[in-house]
Amino acid sequence: MAGSTSTDSLPPLAVVGLSFKFPEDATSSDAFWQMLLEGRCVSTEFPADRMNIDAHYHPDRNRLDSVSMRGGHFLKENLAAFDAPFFSMSAAEAEAMDPQQRMVLETVYRALENAGLPMEKVARSKTSVIAGSFSDDYFLLQTKDPLDMPKYTAVGTSRNMLANRVSWFFDLLGPSVAVDTACSSSLIALDMTCQSIWSGDAAMGVTIGSNVILTPELTMSLDNLGLLSRDSLSYSFDSRANGYARGEGIGVIVIKRLDSAIRDGDTVRAVIRSSSSNQDGKTPGITQPSKDAQVRLIRDTYKKAGLDMSLTRYFEAHGTGTPIGDPIEARAIGMAFRRYMSPEKPLYV
C-alpha cells in the first residue's frame, strides 16, 4: 500500500520470514499459493485417529450432547512425530506436550531459517514472541483421568508455553506472551508484536497463530451456540452462510523494522504500515460484533499510519460465515470506504 498523508506516521515494519503448516498439503508457501490458484477446498471428515465422529454426530442441532457437522479442515501430518532431543527435551516431556507446542517450535525454527537467521544469531536478542491460540484440547485429554496424568502436564499443556517455550529454547529476551481473543487471537498476536517493536520493547518479533482439534468438547460447545456450519464449509458473504467451519494450522512470521531489514540485506516479504485493535463494547449479544467499532478501527488504523484510504483496492475480511456477522462486517467496510469507491474504482473484498 502506498501514499502517505502524514510525515508523523509510525516507522514501517517488514515481514522478513515466514513458515506455516496448513490443512492437507498446504505446508509451504508455494503449495498454499497453488491451492488458492486452484480454488481447492480441503474440507474433510474428522480424521479417524482423532475421534470417532459417528459417536458424536447427530443432525439435530438442538441436541446439546452432539455435533451437527462431520468435518472441518485438518492437518495431514502425524501429530505424534517430533524430534524431542533436537529441542532439548526428554521423551517424557515431549509426550506430555501439546502438539501445538511441538509444531510451533518446528515452525518457528523454519521461519527463522526462512528469514536467513541462524539460531546463534537470534540468541540473547531483544526478540518478542507473541502467540495467539484458541484451544487446549490436549489439556482436556491429559486430565480426563487424574490417576494417569503425565508428570510434565503443567508445562506441556499450559497455553502460555506456546510463547514461553519458544523464548526459552531460542534464548530470546523480549516480551513473551500467549493471548486468547477467540477468532482474532492470531491477529491480536500480530498487533501486539508490532506494538512491542514500535514501543522499543523488542528489536524483532515472532508472531504465532496455532490451532489443533483433538477432542469434541470445544466443537460441541461452539455448535451449541449455532456458530458452526453443518456443511463443514464457510460460506462467507453468501446466502448459504450457516456458520463457520473449524480448521487447524500453525503460522509463524518474523518481523523487524523495515529500515533494519534493508540495512541487514533481508528479504522483505511484506510491509506493515500500521496496526490497531479495539473492542465492540456492549452489543446485543456477547458474540455479536459492532459495525461502528469496526468502522472506527479501520479509520483509526489508516490515520495512525498516515495512509490515503483512496488508494486501497483490496480488503481482506474476517468473513464469519454467519447470518449476523457477515452483514455487519460488510456494512462496516462499506461505510469506511464508501467515499473512496466508484464503479470505476471498486474495492475488492
Predicted regions, residues:
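Condensing-enzyme catalytic core of the thiolase-fold
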Residues: 2-349
